[in-house]
């Protein structure tokens, strides 16, 4: 299957410049400030995600990029053209962006092929027919061309929405919680399929989601948002292993915080033993800190120094997530292979093996 001939496939010196620049924008939502002095840059062919809880401002940012929401300060540039500012508002249809909405927003009275064609404007009937046929084939929808949205599965509706957004060959694809209405198994499969398709065709994409699994499946870079600001813009790996603040550490993945004190520039002593860091920590020796312990940092070891009781378990197929509690009432989360099968009430021995030590000053931890 040949790649989609996107407008951004040329790797000339101009094509190496950022496709999207958001510069210090602020936005209101229902008269309240929703986005504060936010900036981000997306290179051509890059897929990025804005990740955060409901109400953090991520959808407002996406709508501002699409041209559906004004900015109060700053500016937005697409392909070096300013499309948003206090006194600039290029309409959505003139921005050459494709949009996939949370509910897919398919026209219920139109067939699949007519839904896809609805995104094509100012093209000849012949070109429209060829573009629709091409997208039907690429999305595996050819045999569903004459069906209506209510006759399709959730995954098929998702493909139709994506085909409609990509048919005009936009410069930039925007997706708002595109997998939220799918069941877990389907959303994981669709997330990987969409990611592969975007990378294969060198399509630049910005997605917003509250689900870290969706963000990690798609995003080359992910921006974690809190209260209208990006608090960390990084790779999925660094967000998980090197969170820059307590909010990111708490929001990304599972884990618990263990109290400790610095005994050296790269070592922390805790009630469950000493932990060391590959690099120097930022605080003076003796500082009180909270150390992030991920489930994969807790290793099952029959000879381990830490004894704990199983108080909860969640079977996940190849693995089981255990909640453990020590005699000193310290709670840990542990992810063990499922053949290490323990029941609630069993005592297990574990050791801590922290590859990336993440610690924050105790006074910075919110109650």
Predicted regions and their residues:
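A short, flexible loop at the N-terminus of ABC-type nucleotide-binding domains that lies
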Residues: 12-22, 27-37, 86-90
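Short beta-strand immediately N-terminal to the Walker A/P-loop
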Residues: 48-49, 99
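The feature captures the beta-strand-to-loop junction immediately N-terminal to the Walker
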Residues: 51-53
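ABC ATPase NBD Q-loop/coupling interface
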Residues: 75-95
């Amino acid at each position: 299957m040949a790649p989609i001939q996107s407008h951004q496939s040329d790797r000339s010196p101009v094509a190496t410049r950022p496709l999207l620049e958001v510069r210090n924008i602020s936005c209101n939502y229902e008269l309240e400030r929703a986005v504060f002095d936010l900036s981000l840059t997306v290179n051509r062919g890059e897929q990025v995600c804005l990740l955060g809880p409901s109400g953090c401002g991520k959808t407002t940012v996406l709508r501002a990029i699409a041209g559906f929401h004004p900015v109060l300060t700053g500016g937005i540039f697409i392909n070096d053209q300013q499309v948003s500012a206090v006194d600039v508002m290029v309409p959505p249809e003139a921005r050459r962006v494709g949009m996939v909405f949370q509910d897919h927003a398919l026209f219920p009275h139109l067939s699949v092929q007519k839904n896809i064609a609805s995104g094509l404007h100012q093209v000849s009937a012949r070109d429209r027919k060829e573009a629709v046929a091409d997208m039907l084939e690429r999305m595996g929808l050819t045999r569903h061309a004459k069906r209506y949205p209510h006759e399709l599965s959730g995954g098929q509706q998702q493909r139709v929405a994506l085909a409609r957004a990509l048919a005009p060959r936009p410069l930039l694809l925007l997706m708002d919680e595109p997998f939220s209405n799918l069941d877990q198994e389907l959303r994981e499969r669709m997330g990987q399929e969409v990611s592969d398709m975007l990378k294969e065709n060198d399509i630049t994409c910005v997605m917003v989601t509250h689900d870290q699994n969706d963000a990690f499946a798609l995003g080359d870079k992910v921006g974690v948002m809190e209260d209208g600001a990006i608090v960390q813009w990084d790779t999925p790996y660094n967000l998980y292993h090197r969170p820059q603040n307590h909010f990111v550490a708490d929001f990304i993945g599972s884990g618990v915080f263990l109290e400790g004190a610095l005994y050296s520039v790269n070592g922390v002593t805790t009630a469950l033993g000493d932990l060391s860091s590959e690099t120097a920590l930022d605080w003076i020796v003796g500082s009180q800190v909270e150390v992030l312990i991920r489930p994969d940092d807790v290793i099952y070891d029959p000879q381990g120094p830490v004894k704990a009781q199983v108080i909860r378990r969640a079977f996940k197929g190849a693995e089981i997530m255990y909640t453990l509690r020590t005699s000193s009432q310290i709670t840990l989360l542990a992810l063990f292979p499922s053949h290490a099968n323990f029941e609630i009430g069993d005592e297990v021995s574990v050791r801590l093996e922290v590859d990336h030590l993440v610690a924050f000053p105790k006074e910075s931890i919110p109650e």
